[in-house]
Amino acid sequence: MAKTILCHCEDIEIDELYSALEQGYGDLETLKRYTGIGTGKCQGKCCIVQTLRLLASLQTSHTRESMMGDPDLIHLPTIRPPVLPMRIDDIADMEEDTP
Amino acid sequence: MTKTADIVVIGGGVNGLSCAYNLAKRGVKNIVVLEKGYIGVGSTGRCGAGVRQQWGLEENIILARESVKIFENLSGELGFNTFFRQGGYLILITDEHEHEIVAGTLPLQNRLGVPTRLLDTKEIAELVPGLNLDGVIAAAFCPTDGFCYPYAVLWGYAEAARRRGVTIEVNTEVINVEARADGTYTVSTGTTAYQTPVVVNMAGAKTKDIAAYLGITIPTQPFRHEIAVTEPLKPFLDPMVISLKKGFYFSQSIRGEIVGGIGDEHEPSSYQTGSSPEFLLRYAKAIRDTFPALGKARIIRQWAGLYDVSPDARPILGGVDGKPGYFHACGFSGHGFMLSPVVARLMSELITTGCTSIPIDGLNLARFDGGPVTKDPYVVG
Ligand SMILES: Cc1cc2nc3c(=O)[nH]c(=O)nc-3n(C[C@H](O)[C@H](O)[C@H](O)COP(=O)(O)OP(=O)(O)OC[C@H]3O[C@@H](n4cnc5c(N)ncnc54)[C@H](O)[C@@H]3O)c2cc1C
């Protein structure tokens, strides 16, 4: 069967998302940490919106109710710096007092 | 809506969930855990999940040692891989004063069964090739220290607690707790009032706010601590490397990322958990100084969480005189993950039997009423 990759950085297939949902890991914050989606080099720029789209289209019966909560809980996770991966050397060489 | 419970646990962090699990294991039936967000949204989900037994005070060493024993079998017990890896903690020593403190406590640690030993620079270089040893005079190394993946521990406890009948309500914030005339409590969320004889307050840095509903004053303060992670690298680093003096720590996760942080003595007390570029700069300098080759590694993400700091940097555990059925565990001061297995065991003993197999009287809230308290010299950041 063809595989559908959801998160390219971490090589996560769509089936892994479904399996996590079936085990009750239903909200995005938890899915991110359970499957690894969005935690790779691009930090979710490619996969998080796809994951959200899938979550929004799925029947809530897929998930344990207590984890799913209400649809308002489907939101983007906090975007953490740095925006792009940065070398420790490059950071350490930055000037302390740049505004 | 009104519901009843035998025990209401407030907080779905590692302490609340492990306590609920231990209570269920001891036969308590109707346990409800109330968590305002998702599991792990508090400090636990943001922490380094390091587990060490190298402490200066006897009580701290014993608690940490007992926790490690539980961590060693926790994956099997919970039926969930916690990714506990015992690569040891390597405490770098950079001056004579620090040497005196660390070397001075080794006999105590060893007597209590914690196998810490002092390494000279040659042994350090063998253990962690690539460390910059300029200015390092020795290191303390305990091979049975280690770390976990914090979410795995949380989910493991949550699953095991649910299997034993515990109800875990997420996205459910406690907005009031009231003592009733009959000696029980009402714990209110927006939609439900739980009537219960026992309230277990383990709301992390918010524990003191919950306690305040009952007129209990807890002298803890929240402080932001920042942390960062690199892209995954080939496994090369076994121990967690830390400096008590410089306040940094870093280790390599099972996924290969370097996870670490550094404290900031100027950080004011607040509930803010935003990320700062100043931290990144300080951390990058400290890491490059300590392990120059890591300069080539790229940081992909930084975040922050709260330390709930008590006046002596030691946890506050137990009940409160005049409030039967009320219990709390807080003030972990940055060490609440490593202590959670033993804290859960002892708190569940206290709640169900009134006594504990390891004395924790010295950690009760009332200790702050009296004279000065003793701080452990092994506090980082
Ligand atoms: C950057 C960082 C690194 C750390 N590294 C380590 C380490 O290496 N080793 C170690 O041992 N410790 C470490 N710590 C400390 C550790 O994270 C904490 O001590 C520990 O996780 C505390 O667990 P807890 O369950 O008591 O609290 P929390 O995990 O904070 O859980 C409390 C829960 O209560 C919930 N809550 C709060 N108010 C309410 C309310 N009104 N109603 C319902 N729920 C509520 C919160 O949402 C939260 O989920 C670190 C902390 C940080 C920030």
Question: Residues of each region from the PLM?
Answer:
Chain B
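Active-site lid/adjacent beta-loop-alpha segment flanking the redox-cofactor pocket in flavoenzymes
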Residues: 232-325
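Glycine-rich FAD pyrophosphate-binding loop
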Residues: 24-44
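Central helical "cap/lid" subdomain
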Residues: 192-238
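Dinucleotide-binding Rossmann-like beta1-alpha1 core, especially the glycine-rich loop
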Residues: 48-127, 247-248, 278, 286-288
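Beta1/beta-strand and adjacent pyrophosphate-binding region of the FAD-binding site
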Residues: 2-15, 32
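Helical element adjacent to the flavin cofactor pocket in flavoenzyme catalytic cores
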Residues: 142-197
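C-terminal catalytic lobe of FAD-dependent flavoproteins
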Residues: 288-381
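Helix-loop-beta segment of a Rossmann-like dinucleotide-binding subdomain
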Residues: 82-93, 105, 112, 118, ...
